[in-house]
Regions:
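Conserved ABC ATPase "signature" region
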Residues: 87-105
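Catalytic Walker B motif of ABC-type/P-loop ATPase nucleotide-binding domains
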Residues: 134-137
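Helix-to-loop junction immediately C-terminal to a conserved catalytic motif
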Residues: 30
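The feature captures the beta-strand-to-loop junction immediately N-terminal to the Walker
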Residues: 15-17
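H-loop (His-switch) and adjacent beta-strand-loop-beta switch element
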Residues: 182-195
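H-loop/switch region of ABC-family ATPase nucleotide-binding domains
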Residues: 170-171
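Conserved ABC ATPase signature
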Residues: 109-113, 117
Length: 212
């Protein structure tokens, strides 16, 4: 069993080898899979207040919708039986697009955007779903260095200024050690949870992060 806590305003990076269970953990936090053992107490999940930014597939990158339509779809799980977006939802979508710097792209086709622009659109979509917590699965994979740093800067702003808790699965160890407050390392031989400094002093941290 692994044990960890994420509080309001925390920034947790989940790292470790491929196949160690990171994606399974994320799906359990989202309520898509039951935990293999133990329990998950996630008030944000019960309240429907989690924004999720998944890894993109090639088909998703080629999705033929406008930026505005993609962002508004973040409200889908909150609409219930309502088929149309409310004025408040449309206003919030515009606000989130402005916050992420994609407002001027709102009428553009999503599949025509660069990788960095698409990630910002998906993050605006996640904010429409999120009140308390953002969960991101490998958000910088495939991005060029400039787009990567831009995304990290945006996440830092949301975490520090808007007190949004962030849980990010990543293989970008350098970025994780720089941005996170805490590290959850999941390995085939065990796990570690603690601050960045504690992680770097641990056997797992010395193996995976000590060379950086």
């Amino acid at each position: 069993h692994l044990t960890f806590t994420v509080r309001a305003g925390d920034y947790l990076c989940v790292v470790g080898e491929n196949g160690s269970g990171k994606s399974t953990l994320m799906k359990s936090l989202l309520g898509l899979l039951p935990p293999l053992a133990g329990t998950i107490d996630c008030p944000a999940q019960r309240a429907g207040a989690i924004g999720y930014l998944p890894q993109q597939t090639s088909a998703q990158r080629d999705f033929p919708a406008t930026v505005s339509e993609v962002v508004l779809s973040g409200f889908a799980n909150k609409r219930g039986l309502h088929f149309f977006y409310s004025a408040a939802e449309k206003s919030a979508a515009l606000m989130n697009m402005g916050k992420l710097g994609v407002l001027e792209l709102q009428n553009r086709c999503y599949r025509e955007l660069s990788g960095g622009q698409q990630q910002r659109v998906l993050l605006a979509r996640a904010l429409c779903a999120a009140d308390r917590l953002l969960i991101l699965d490998e958000p910088v994979t495939g991005l060029d260095p400039a787009a990567t740093q831009d995304l990290y800067k945006t996440l830092r702003y949301l975490n520090e200024k808007e007190k949004m808790a962030v849980i990010m699965v990543t293989h970008d160890m350098r970025g994780a050690l720089r941005e996170a407050h805490t590290i959850l390392h999941i390995g085939r031989d065990g796990w570690f949870f603690g601050t960045v400094a504690e992680y770097l002093a641990s056997p797992a941290g010395k193996r995976f992060g000590g060379a950086l």
